[in-house]
UniProtKB/Swiss-Prot annotation:
Superkingdom: Bacteria
Protein name: Replication initiation protein
GO biological process: DNA replication
Miscellaneous comment as given in the Swiss-Prot or TrEMBL entry: The nicking site of REP proteins is sequence, but not plasmid, specific.
Pfam family, one: RepD-like_N
Originating organism: Staphylococcus aureus
Family membership noted in the UniProt record: Belongs to the plasmid replication initiation factor family.
Keyword flag Chloroplast: no
Length: 311
């Protein structure tokens, strides 16, 4: 199938949402959710694979003359490149891969920033040269048109939690885990980030992102990767005992207090905080993921397989 036919196939199969799922007006059952379903997408991908000697030569020859590629650090057994207006990073290093016993080529990109034609170009001209290829990073992004600074986020697991506050004293960024871990969760004010970076103006009143960065073995669990996460609106006045009210209020407003509790007390108050919250946005995230799981799987299949398009 030619590139033109591939492109037509994408358009004719109603795949305008190939990169991003759209907003939906549906709600979970009950009256708790006034927040629209988030927009869901894969926001970053890393694909690794092996170039054999023949394909390494073919790809190197192609890249050295292709105007859409900027190539540097070129030797017989390695090169680095950026493609498609710097939107794609490509690296090949056979010596390093052999010494570290890992695959020798890596391609990094954000699929949301690529057009259908650019996806096809990247797939046909770069990724299809690789053998034994697979994902080593997937970022799952949920964009909410709601102010998530008013919510309390926590995990059932014992992971490091870091919070950065904005000028108004409200949380602006929350991290769960560490950057090099197999799963790293970011919750941040996307509208403020775009404003700070002089990026595209966001027209909606609020735009917050919950981003789940998955690496290595965790990429296989992209459709079941945040069961332990909770984004809540707990009412600290709900518990009958004043002592429990006071402790919940302290835990919600002074994060350092968690570190002073013994394990059984942490478990008790995490359970209590979940019980006194009528809302858990992660339930909305799960339903959104379930609705869009097939479409997201098609994207993964597109990058990993030869051109056998789904029906």
């Amino acid at each position: 199938m030619s590139t033109e036919n591939h492109s037509n196939y994408l358009q004719n199969k109603d795949l305008d949402n190939f990169s991003k799922t759209g907003y939906s007006n549906s709600r979970l059952s009950g009256n708790f959710f006034t927040t629209p379903q988030p927009e869901l997408s894969f926001d970053a991908m890393t694909i690794v694979g092996n170039l054999n000697k023949t394909n390494a030569k073919k790809l190197s020859d192609f890249m050295s003359t292709e105007p859409q590629i900027r190539l540097w650090d070129i030797l017989q057994t390695k090169f680095k490149a950026k493609a498609l207006q710097e939107k794609v990073y490509i690296e090949y290093d056979k010596v390093k891969a052999d010494s570290w016993d890992r695959r020798n080529m890596r391609v990094e990109f954000n699929p949301n920033k690529l057009t259908h034609e650019e996806m096809l170009w990247l797939k046909q001209n770069i990724i299809d040269y690789m053998e034994d290829d697979g994902f080593t990073r997937l970022d799952l992004a949920f964009d909410f048109e709601d102010d998530l600074s008013d919510y309390y986020a926590m995990t059932d697991k014992a992971v490091k939690k870091t919070i950065f506050y904005g000028r108004n004293g409200k949380p602006e960024t929350k991290y769960f885990g560490v950057r090099d871990s197999d799963r790293f969760i970011r919750i941040y004010n996307k509208k403020q980030e775009r404003k700070d970076n002089a990026d595209v103006e966001v027209m909606s009143e609020h735009l917050w992102r919950v981003e789940i960065e998955l690496k290595r073995d965790m990429v296989d669990y992209w459709n079941d990767c945040f069961d332990d996460l909770h984004i809540l609106k707990p009412d600290w006045t709900t518990p009958e005992k004043v002592k429990e009210q006071a402790m919940v209020y302290l835990l919600l407003n002074e994060e350092g207090t968690w570190g002073k509790l013994e394990r059984h007390a942490k478990y008790k108050y995490k359970q209590l905080i979940k019980e006194i919250s009528p809302i858990d946005l992660t339930e909305l995230m799960k339903s959104t993921l379930k609705e869009n799981e097939k479409q997201l799987q098609k994207q993964i299949d597109f990058w990993q397989r030869e051109f056998r398009f789904w029906k």
